[in-house]
Amino acid sequence: MLWTDCLTRLRQELSDNVFAMWIRPLVAEEVEGILRLYAPNPYWTRYIQENHLELISILAEQLSEGRVRQVEILVDSRPGSILSSSEQPATTTAALQTAPIPQPAKVKREPEPVANTAVSSKSSKKKLLNPQFTFSLFVEGRSNQMAAETCRKVLTQLGASQHNPLFLYGPTGLGKTHLMQAVGNALLQAKPNARVMYMTSESFVQDFVSSLQKGKVEEFKKNCRSLDLLLVDDIHLLAGKEASLVEFFYTFNALLDESKQIILTSDRYPKELTELDPRLVSRFSWGLSVGVEPPDIETRIEILLKKAENSGVDLPRNCALFIAQQVVANVRELEGALNKVVAISRFKGAPIDLDVVRESLKDVLAIRARTISVENIQRVVSEYFRIPLKELVGPKRTRIYARPRQLAMGLARELTGDSFPEIGMAFGGRDHSTVMHACEKVVSLREEDPIFDEDYKNLLRLLQS
């Protein structure tokens, strides 16, 4: 039967939990080239439409060899079905607010925790805070220092209105999850009986839906609203999850009313989350929003050295510098590069040196050679400041050319693997000491001059995009 074949493929494509909870209970029939799937209620049909109908349609057409060209998902109102028409709620929203979704027949599932939770040591629930995500293992630099200091301050003033909620934002892989979980780990260490819950937006949705299906909505609400600290990762991914957004809105308000601390992360500043309910976005701005930026080269070096030290790996500083020059996007990629270097070193039975590093990162080096070069940096900087390229690399020392030139040299040192002499040659044959001085000047100017620092960040984004 076509649906049986589809189920076999869907089991391979989807997680066991999603397959058992959402796909297996569906009833199917094929009518004149249409595969009709029946779900117990409107909420179920909407979930399938939004998340899995496209995949099911592709599989149905492939496995039927073109016989089936359309897949429909309907509420099962047939006589004797799981949910007869007389039992259907008037609207999806009403169903969500007034009644749990009935448990489909023939589906047997093991009990699950209501949420991804870290609570006191006396709790039987699984502790999902990463024990490695502590303040002592977090490497601070200019790009994340304010966020780290704010998180420490939250611990001393838990629930204080000036930083509740605390909203950490920035691109993926920069340590936002590490910082928020560091707060949770530190709180549990100081107060073992504190109630701390960490979850992603996805797990919040899954756990909320699961509670609806099992008739345990009140238990879910109680767990979420009786906390001392709620940590939610990637809050922007709640977009489009209407019922879950409503529940999160009430949970958010309940915790704030009790002065319980909330920490959220997102890839964007709160007011840029235009796809979320404006009321919720407004509440995100009630406390304190702190950005986390890509680490500069000094911070990247320290991250590598600390990671190596904690792993018992001997990483020479010149090798850390080389890796940091090649991998600039985020901390996650940086750690991935180090893991690859360590793996190659162990495979060859050789200590880590520049030859091992170059061999390990040859794919990265090949890509960067095609994308970021000193010449490319010079072109982008000259266009950004609207100055002729010949003046950028020329001998004139007037401020209008000197500052962009220093900035370009600093970027070249950070983004390419070129040495000081090589960079100097690309800038009109200047010697290595001139380039070294320019790079040192860039570091000090970024600390002293906010406009210069902003120009540096803008160019960094342009070159990395």
Swiss-Prot record:
Gene3D superfamilies on file: 1.10.1750.10, 1.10.8.60, 3.30.300.180, P-loop containing nucleotide triphosphate hydrolases
CDD domains: AAA (cd00009), Bac_DnaA_C (cd06571)
GO biological process, one term: regulation of DNA replication
Domain III, AAA+ region: region residues: 128-345
GO molecular function: ATP binding; ATP hydrolysis activity; DNA replication origin binding; lipid binding
Region listing for Domain I, interacts with DnaA modulators, in residue ranges: 1-87
Protein keywords: ATP-binding, Cytoplasm, DNA replication, DNA-binding, Lipid-binding, Nucleotide-binding
Region Disordered: start-end pairs: 81-123
Location in the cell: Cytoplasm
Region called Domain II, residue ranges: 88-127
Compositionally biased tracts (Low complexity): 88-100
Complex and partners: Oligomerizes as a right-handed, spiral filament on DNA at oriC.
Protein name in UniProt: Chromosomal replication initiator protein DnaA
Biological source species: Acinetobacter baumannii (strain AYE)
